Amino acid sequence: MEIASRIAGASSYTRAMGVNLPELTLEIFSGSDIDFVLPNDYTVEQDRALYNAYDSNISFSKVYMDYDDTVTCRGKLNDQIIQFIAKCKNHKIPVILLSRHDGDLNTELSNWGITGLFDKVVHMDRKKPKSDFISDKNSIFIDDSFGERKQVKEAVGIPTFEPSMVEFLINRRGF
């Protein structure tokens, strides 16, 4: 027989409505007088799906990434990339932006409010390969361009990722 304190997975629905059942339970057990809850006034439909989690022996101490079609895509910030950058920040892993962006890259970063996310911004000329700017062998490279990833992989020998592959990097156990 198993005895354990736990909450039902479906209680996430009530949290989405603004009612935190575990918190209410703690309040009741601490002697608080709870005679009402404060649900929010909107509709919520819950869809429960599988969540991918990965185990891997990959290790890196620096991230190099592209800007166009990687950090931004179709006129919007790539929220998965931004989430990955935030996780890197939490783990003190520097993120270096390597870009051949047409126009004023610093202004564009400022307009998106993401200037401070990068430890270094390299606005490159189109003639130099990105691998020329990658000095740390214990790093990874993220770019939407297969050609860029291939060139970096061959020149530097580090793991390379297409932007949609960051799900793997975000959902690694222990990261």
Give residue spans per PLM region:
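Alpha-helical substrate-recognition element adjacent to the catalytic core
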Residues: 41-125
